[in-house]
Amino acid sequence: MVKKNFIPSVSLVRRDLPTLVTTTTSSTALSKPTSSVVSETSSKSLPSLTSSAFSTSSGATSSSSLIVASITPPSTAGNPFILNAADKPNGTVYIAVGAVIGAIFISILIWWLVSSYLSRRFTMTNSYANDSKNLYRGHHKHSSSLQSNPFDINDEKSYMQDDWDSMSQLESSQYEDAASPFNPIQDPFTDXRRSLFISPTLQVSQYEKSHSRHQSKDTNIFIDDPSLYVGTYLEEEEEEERKLNLNRPQRAASPERKEKKINSMEGYHKRNQSSLGLIPVASATSNTSSPKKAHKRQAPSMFLDDVLNGREII
């Protein structure tokens, strides 16, 4: 028995695709009548697609309105509380701020110019007063210049008094040059030194002594005749000669000192028994040939210690 392949029969039934239903809703503006919902239903089938739409509208209509307020600025005409900027340029605020800043800078510049001018004027006035004080040499010589300047009579008197004092000090310094601590070196009549000792404190001590003597005198009184006080000066010199130890070492001349006049060094040579810077005359030879008092010879170091301790007067 021959078996045959059994093929079952299959019946194909054609089925349609599921239908798609699309619903759309549209609305109009509020001010216009609203329309009802429109539903559209489409049924499609393969291979042809059929669609059908159904629209219905309601018979009743409704209307709505919206009130919008418009903003209008108030008018500036006749209103004193509102600035009328219609005739003002653009950027008025910036212009005002810039003007204020510029005014501040201009005021600072003016203040600086005025202060500089006043300071310069004050400096010129002081310098003119100092020049007038230094150049003034008598009432009749500069009376016209003093009358032309803006100073009163008190300033003129003070200038005269200062000039008088300076002249008095000049006259008195001519007779006090003998106590000068300086020593000339350009002298052909240099005396041979007996010792090589050089005192480092001699110059300072002589300066302090001359300074104290100068302060003790009244330099504000001017004496026209110098011969009235020459005798007193010579007596002081003789007293100093008696106090000085003539056997002590002499002072060495410094190469940095300048030569002075001979008449201003007479007192120095009298005290130190030296002919340095002097032309040998009869008075100098008589002074040097006078007998000396016998003194005990003192070592240079002991003499320096006495000077530093104040026991020795220079």
UniProtKB/Swiss-Prot annotation:
Membrane spanning stretches: 93-113
Q: How does it sit in the membrane?
A: Single-pass membrane protein
Question: Does the UniProt entry include the keyword Manganese?
Answer: no
- Phosphoserine occurs at 148, 254, 274
Q: Which domain of life is it from?
A: Eukaryota
InterPro entries documented for this protein: PRM (IPR051009)
What is the protein's major site of localization? membrane
Signal peptide bounds: none
State where the protein is found: Vacuole membrane
List keywords of the entry alphabetically.
Answer: Membrane, Phosphoprotein, Transmembrane, Transmembrane helix, Vacuole
Annotated segments matching region Disordered? 32-60, 240-309
Composition bias, kind Basic and acidic residues: at what positions? 254-269
What does the sequence similarity comment in the record state about its family? Answer: Belongs to the PRM5 family.
Name of this chain's protein? Vacuolar membrane protein VIN13_4115
Which species is this UniProt entry from? Saccharomyces cerevisiae (strain VIN 13)
